[in-house]
């Protein structure tokens, strides 16, 4: 198992798309931070208050809009902090979009090659290969979060007159839970990619997850559940993408428990489904 994990990590760090996506992500963060800095200078106090209330959920119900929506939760009169922009990009799934693209490319890179056929014939249990990919994606998730934090910190120092990081304890709590949620999202994407064995369809479905397209389907399920006389139940609250959006900067115990439970449940189920399909498939 350790050899398979080392092999997958070696393959991941040899993948050119890993570094290309990181570079594009860095450029995107620098560009969007520069735009945010310019826009904040033009907003009135009323507009800043409205944006703050919207970003912190004070002006909306428990729903998620279609598409990407990055809003900075900075209080009127305060300087935009690293935590504010980190939160805005995470909540809007800006970071998740880059991560799922890599997850699809990495998960399907060797599915049709002679390499995977050769390796699968040598191991006792093919499911170990899926687990090894999962470990590699966890390492990728942690590294991407660290890189994102570093680039966002540099961007804030470059584009804002005053540098403010934000409350460190709250940041670590939020970032830690979001790391696990994003890892769960990548495991879901990996499962989709390996089961379907089609880059185009897998990429489309993964992007749809980040664009909240499935909200329409979740609303349909909510209506069916409501007709069964089950009140105040929302499917979105028990999905990975829903928890990525709903998690607030001031993480409560309920938010943390729900997010952790959903993440762990999806990771276990998706790896089991993916490994079972991969084990039985004729490669």
Predicted regions and their residues:
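Aromatic- and glycine-rich beta-strand/loop motifs that create alpha-glucan
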Residues: 1-25
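Short loop-to-helix capping motifs
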Residues: 15-16, 124-125, 197-199
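Secretory targeting signals
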Residues: 22-106, 130-200, 206-207, 211-215, ...
């Amino acid at each position: 198992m350790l050899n398979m994990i080392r092999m997958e990590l070696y393959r991941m760090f040899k993948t050119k798309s890993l570094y290309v996506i990181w570079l594009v992500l860095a450029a995107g963060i620098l560009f969007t931070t520069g735009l945010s800095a310019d826009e904040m200078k033009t907003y009135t106090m009323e507009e800043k208050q409205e944006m703050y209330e919207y970003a912190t959920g004070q002006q909306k119900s428990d729903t998620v809009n279609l598409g990407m929506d990055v809003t900075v939760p900075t209080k009127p009169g305060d300087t935009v902090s690293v935590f504010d922009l980190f939160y805005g990009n995470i909540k809007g799934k800006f970071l998740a979009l880059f991560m799922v693209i890599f997850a699809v490319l990495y998960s399907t890179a060797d599915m049709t090659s002679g390499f995977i056929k050769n390796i699968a014939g040598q191991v006792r249990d093919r499911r170990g290969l899926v687990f090894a990919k999962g470990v590699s994606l966890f390492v990728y998730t942690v590294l991407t979060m660290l890189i994102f934090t570093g680039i966002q910190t540099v961007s804030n120092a470059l584009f804002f007159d005053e540098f403010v990081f934000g409350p460190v304890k709250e940041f670590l709590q939020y970032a830690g839970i979001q790391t696990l949620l994003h890892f769960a999202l990548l495991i879901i994407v990996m499962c989709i990619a390996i089961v379907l064995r089609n880059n185009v369809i897998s990429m489309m479905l993964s992007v749809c997850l980040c664009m909240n397209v499935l909200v329409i389907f979740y609303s349909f399920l909510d209506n069916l559940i409501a007709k069964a006389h089950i009140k105040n139940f929302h499917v979105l609250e028990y999905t990975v993408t829903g928890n990525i959006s709903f998690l607030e900067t001031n993480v409560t115990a309920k938010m943390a428990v729900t997010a952790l439970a959903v993440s762990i449940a999806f990771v276990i189920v998706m790896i089991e489904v993916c490994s079972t399909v991969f084990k039985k498939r004729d490669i």
